[in-house]
C-alpha cells in the first residue's frame, strides 16, 4: 500500500497547493500566521504522521520553502503575464502558502477521490480540513467584497474568478511538489497506512465538500460575476498556459471556453479602477461639453444668420411693396397725364378750329378790303366824271336842285356794289364756316341802317328852315370860317332798292322849301343865293360814297357861324368821321368843300360834358390810391391819372383846336 498512499498524499498536497494558488484575489482577508495556527489547532500528539511529513505541510521549513513556487510564479502561471504583479499594489505576503483560505475544487472527480481516501487521511488532511472549515466563513466575505467590487464599470476580480483558476498552475504546483513528497514517502513508508480517521474529521470534510459543491455556492457565484467580469475579461483563456492541460477536466463545468484574455486594468485596485473610470468619464464629459458648446455656437450662429436672413427678407419685401406702390402711383400719374394730354389736344383742336375760323374771317376781310379798294378807285373815276357834268349852267333854282346826276352816280355805285356783293357771296359760299359770322354782322348793320333811316325820317318831318340849318352852308364871306361836315360811315351794307327809293324820296322833298328859305336870311347877296343850288348839288355829290359797300348819311353838327345856334342830338351808335376841307374859290364864285384834310373831332358841344368825360375816370384811381397806399412808399398816381389831369387843365384850349383849319 505504499504507492497508493504516496499517490493519495500527492493528490492532497496538489489539492492544497491548488487551494493556495486560488486564494490570490485583490481583496484578501489575512489570517494569523500559519505556524502559530498549526500549533494551536493540530497538536503533535494527534498527528499520525512523522515530523518529516508534517514538515512538508509547514511552508516555513527549508525543504518546503526551497521547493515551493512563489506567488509570482503562480501569478505568471495563472494569467500568462509575469509583469502583472508589479502593476497591482496589493501583493500576497511571502507566506502565501500558509494562508488559511482554501477552496475546494469545483469538479466531481476531486470529490469522488476524497470519498475514496477518506479513511486513510492523516494529520495533514485534518489540518487541511480545519483550514477548509475556517475558510468556509471566509468564502462569504470575499464573495460579498467581490460583488461590491464587481459593481464598478471596468470590472474587478471577483472571488469566483479566483476560485476558477487555471489547471496549469495546479499541474505545475503538483509537479514541483513531487520531489519532497517522494522523499517523505520514502521516509514514512514504515508508517501504518491504515490509521483510522476520527468521525469528527469525516463530518467536517463531508460538510466542507458539500458546501463547496453545492449549486448555491458554485454555480450562482459564477452567474452574477460573469457579467460584471466580462467587461474586464477576468476569465482566463485555456491557451495562455505554457503547460498542456487535460481537456477532460473541464468537460463537466464548462470553464473558460473561448474567453478573451483580461485587460491590464483588472490588476488595479478598485479605487484606482474608479479613478480611471472617473478620468475616462471626465474626458468623455469634456468632449461632450466641447461638442455641446460647438453645437450651441453653431446653433447661435445659425440663429443669427436666420435673423439676418429674416431682416433681409423683410427689407426686400418692404422694398418690393414700395416699388409696387410707386409703380401704381406712376401708373395713376401716367393715366392722369394721358387724360390731361387728351383734354389739351381737344381744347387745342377747338382752338385750332377757332383760329382757322379767324384766319378765314381775316382772309374774307382782306378780300373785302381789296374789293373796297377797287370799288373806291372806280367810284373816284366816276366822281371825276360827275364833276365834269356839273359845270353846265342851270335855268332855274328848282331845276338846279335836281338830283339826277347824283342819283345816276348812286345807281352806278349800287350796280357796282351789287357786283361786289355777288362776288363776296360767291367767296362766302366757298368758305362755309364764316356764314354765321357774316349773317350776324349783316344783322347789326341792318339795325344801324334802320336807325339811320329813322333819323332821315326825322329830318323829313322838320320844317324847311331847320333843314337848311342842318346843312353846311356858307352864309357870308366876311367871317372867313370853314364849313365843317360831319358824316357817318357805316360798314359793309348790302343795299336794297327800297333803301335807294327812300333816299330819293327824301331828297326830292328837300327840293321844295329851298327857295323860300334861301330868300329869307339875307337879301343883299343875290349871287350867293343863286349859287347856292349849285353848291348844294355839289355837296350832295361830294357825299356820295367812294366805296359802293358803304353809305354816307348826314348828321347834324355844330357850326361856328353866329346865326346857327341849334344843338343837335345825334345818334352815336356808329363811328364818326370828321371831314375838314380847305376853301377853294371857283370861277363862278361858289366855295365848295374840298377833300384835302381830315380832322378827327372827339369833343362834344358842351364843355361840362367833356370835363366829366376826362375827369371822371380819375376818381376810382384816386380812391383806390387813398384806400390801399396808406403809409406806403409807392406813388399815389399813375400815368393815366397824370395825363387826364393835364388834359383837364388844358381842356379849353384842346376843345378849340378841333375847329381850327389845317391846310
Curated annotation (Swiss-Prot):
Residues 81-97 have a biased composition (Polar residues). Residues 310-417 are annotated as: Sufficient for interaction with STX1A. Residues 57-73, 145-158, 188-198, 221-241 have a biased composition (Low complexity). Isoform 3, isoform 4 and isoform 5 are expressed in HeLa cell line (at protein level). Isoform 3 is expressed in fetal and adult brain. Isoform 4 is expressed in numerous fetal tissues (brain, kidney, liver, lung, and thymus) and in adult brain, kidney, liver, lung, pancreas, colon, prostate, small intestine, testis and thymus. Isoform 5 is expressed in fetal brain, brain and small intestine. Residues 271-353 form a coiled coil. It comes from the Eukaryota. GO terms for biological process: anterograde neuronal dense core vesicle transport; axonal transport of mitochondrion; positive regulation of insulin secretion involved in cellular response to glucose stimulus; regulation of synaptic activity; synapse maturation. The modification Phosphoserine is found at residues 50, 107, 396, 555. The chain crosses the membrane at residues 606-626. PANTHER family: MICROTUBULE-ASSOCIATED PROTEIN/SYNTAPHILIN (PTHR16208), SYNTABULIN (PTHR16208:SF4). This is Syntabulin. It comes from Homo sapiens (Human).
